[in-house]
């Protein structure tokens, strides 16, 4: 068998990461009813590159203000975690600003407050922005091109780069607003 990022062990690790906050959702419970077969099927679909993301779940939240949410199904979240597990360290070292705190390990509210309390003693500016439809307005071609540039510069085997670029392309170019369900 050829080398691949999409091993059963990596899929299982991504599953455990994914279920930390989603374990009680209907999608996660359904997935766990036939866990081993579902993990094996996902592993095979990724290895043969036949994986296709499922439809998104659509709902509206009202706090802090009304907004539409298109959430990935549990199985698709596992694939997101596979990708994150592989590229997170690269992003941490090369891409993210040191004072960006959103969705980063060891950079939660406490880190942000400590950083802000240190910086407030100097002349500092701070901004919190909520851009309407931010994620849906990102140019996916540009995003994927930037992603490719970063991955191609890594000192990793070509099979790793091929797997990561294929999965990132599938995820980036999936439109969650098409074929969603309530």
What is the meaning of each model-derived region?
Residues 11, 42-65, 78, 120, ...:
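Reverse-transcriptase-like RNA-dependent polymerase core
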Residues 45, 118-182:
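Conserved polymerase palm-domain catalytic core
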Residues 1, 8, 84-140:
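Active-site-proximal segment of RNA-dependent polymerases
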Residues 78-84:
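Active/ligand-binding-proximal structured segments within catalytic/core domains
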Residues 1-40:
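Non-catalytic, polymerase-adjacent accessory regions of viral genome-replication enzymes
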Residues 21-29, 54-78, 95-106, 172-182:
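Short, conserved non-catalytic motifs in the polymerase core
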């Amino acid at each position: 068998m050829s080398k691949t990022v999409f091993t059963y062990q990596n899929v299982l690790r991504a599953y455990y990461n994914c279920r930390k906050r989603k374990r009680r959702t209907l999608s996660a419970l359904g997935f766990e009813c036939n866990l081993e077969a579902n993990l094996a099927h996902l592993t095979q679909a990724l290895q043969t590159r036949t994986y296709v993301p499922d439809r998104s779940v659509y709902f509206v939240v009202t706090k802090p203000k009304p907004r539409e949410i298109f959430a990935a199904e549990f199985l698709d979240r596992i694939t997101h975690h596979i990708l994150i597990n592989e590229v997170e360290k690269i992003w941490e070292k090369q891409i993210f600003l040191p004072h960006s705190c959103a969705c980063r390990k060891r950079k939660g509210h406490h880190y942000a407050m400590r950083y802000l309390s240190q910086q407030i003693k100097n002349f500092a500016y701070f901004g919190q922005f909520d851009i309407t439809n931010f994620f849906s307005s990102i140019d996916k071609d540009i995003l994927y091109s930037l992603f490719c540039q970063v991955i191609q510069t890594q000192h990793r085997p070509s099979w790793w780069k091929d797997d990561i670029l294929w999965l990132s392309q599938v995820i980036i170019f999936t439109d969650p607003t098409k074929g969603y369900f309530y």
